[in-house]
Amino acid sequence: SCVDAGLSLMSFPPDLDEAFKKFIPPFGASGNPVDITGGEPPTTYKNTIRLGLEDPRIHALILGYWHTIITPPMVFGKLVVEVINEMKAKGIEKPIVASLAGDVQVEEAAEYLYDHGVPAYAYSTEIPVAVLGAKYRWARGAGLVK
């Protein structure tokens, strides 16, 4: 989907890879994409999203969420908004899109995220990536990014 949308994934330098490994379980995957796995508590989501926003080498985030009991959909939605607001207070803002999969509860969480400025879509990975691609095409056309 990223290639189709005109986006590319960066190769993580070793220090960034190690920074993500501090937060994810050994059976997760650092690198790009980062996979924290579905059984992680809210703090893991917060820490990895925060790291992605804080590191200047990362320009945007595509969040993929699958409904879990440990971090239910609305908990995920609210923690994403919380971390975004925390970073905005520090002057850090980056494009973020989200894909949520699961049952009808992910629809509510996607709507919550959307209402708080995060383009979020239930049951689709392609749409949020296409939205991010459109943002980048516009920004390139406006001369804001290369």
Where are these predicted regions, by residue range?
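Short secondary-structure capping/turn micro-motifs that flank functional sites
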Residues: E18-A19, I69, V129-A130
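Short Asp/Glu-rich motifs
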Residues: K21-K22, P72, E108, L132
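Short, small-residue-enriched loops and turns at beta-alpha junctions
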Residues: T68-P72, D103-V104
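Short glycine-cluster motifs
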Residues: S1-W66, V75
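Short, glycine/charged-rich beta-strand-loop motifs at protein surfaces that mediate ligand recognition
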Residues: H67-I70, I96-A98
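Peripheral docking tails and interdomain loops at the edges
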Residues: S1-A5, G77-K146
